């Protein structure tokens, strides 16, 4: 009997104190007392607090719960759309329920307990909000609430994705828990997507948590809140859900075409002479590259944006030299300022620092972190960059340590200090959004001739609207971490922020003379070729990280993939326009295109690069084959042209020089001429590869390659349609124009087959040559 009692007690304690299960303790029911219809939704008075549903569109519903009757006003930072067009919706009220219906959704609120059930128009349950709670608490001296939502998942087999980039090596978060908190290598975005065809945008900037460790229960919670606030976004396709997120938080602008080329970087170039020498050698060797990067410690002291003259005697001349050689230069800039400089003293006097503390072994005591929440401090920060760097021609901004960097999560500077906006814990995840907005808005106000490009180590919801890409942080240089980058990048991309890259080869260590490390670098570079951005970086034992640093055999392979990247620029740049204008995502987990195929739910090491390419990174040393799942479709081996039917797994050939790549039937892939930088020559002729076996469409996009005239309509598109039944290709009338546009061009049409239209090299015998002058042409096989 005693043993039985002990077991009961142990079970009870485990239930009460298991992480995430505290919210599952019994709470009194919170019935609906009254309902008020408003112009854009309904407000329900509850026994405890109030619940409000706002109909934003047919597929987007905002849900808010307040512990008091009123909904306090607050300043929005993440969501920038507050004026929604009128949407037709209906409300039905019975003794048991209140139902809000749109053309796509039905939302059922139970009167007995105020639970909320989201259904599609057919009545299929998508998501259930079973309970919400707001628990009074004190955080960083502020009286506030801990917010939590509970959803029961009994009988649901859905998978969960998104939440930003995390390094656990997990793609499908079913059965997992994730801290939504910023730190080096973990980028948190409060946006969750379900294979049931919906997304939840959790509108809170404090440290939060997703917890599904108990498979039949989902908890979403935040440390600081006045109101529990989220948006329910319905697809069911993921592109539509992501499009809804961007409608809320902003669309990503186009980068300059150069940004989609190759980025050469290492830790670090130490002198002007070294940097220019590397750039000149790339041009001498005719290796394609657009961008070179100056990492940290170019300054004479941190926070003072002045080059160390002993190592960089002529910064304007250096930039001019790079531009003459068709390079763009990105430079590292940090949010920390060192005592003892004029800039530090001036910022301190103005109250522009959040805190002054030791934040790491390489930072001196009393380092100041600028207050990116202060609009005047943001202007000041950009002005430093503008006067010292942008005005001499710098092209891109590497914003490092934008979490901001701290010793650990528990001593996060924001959590324990006050900002210009108030309690830092309330805005703990928002620093990267605010600091990228400082640079984006600053450069946009300074010039419209050069598109903003920011590479940030962290991001938050909305950062995509600031022209911000991210890299995956300071990851190790080994196979384990390489493998983890694939699901990390896929989850970041599906979180609505489309531009992601990684330190090819890893950041921490790596010896280019070591044959084993060379293999890792090659495989990582092959993967990186099909990332939204192609970039090498790292700390190498030889201090060499250029493509010729890895030996002649490796160099041949690396340059071949670099060449492929440049041939694919018409395809990649057109995808970038789709991303800006249509809510598209270039790097796509298989579930994005094959959501109803249950076998794709947990495949996080294969992905689609745009509509055509399935990419299958090789993540095991010494591998010569790669187990690959092909969803139901006809697929072509990119290297051989051989076709294979899907809905099965195969062992794809994967010798060191070949990354397994398959192209889906119905794809139309434009490949441009080989070039050494993105704008060396016009995209003419274009080899147009047609992968027969299904109908297909593709739209080629072109503009001036830089500047913001595209926002004013200065761009052109050409639509291609393949009709598989008729075996005919229609090249439509060109739409739009811009200065410098090609008015006449040649399309080399290639109907891909075995050993025809394959690999990197242009097809020597195209099937059709089409002279195009902007008017529709129909091409038959």
Task: Please give the residue ranges for each predicted region.
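Bacterial N-terminal signal peptides that target proteins for export
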Residues: 1-9
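N-terminal accessory segment at the very beginning of proteins
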Residues: 23-249, 253-258, 265-267, 274, ...
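Bacterial N-terminal signal peptides
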Residues: 8-20
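Catalytic-domain carbohydrate-binding cleft regions of carbohydrate-active enzymes
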Residues: 124-658, 663-664
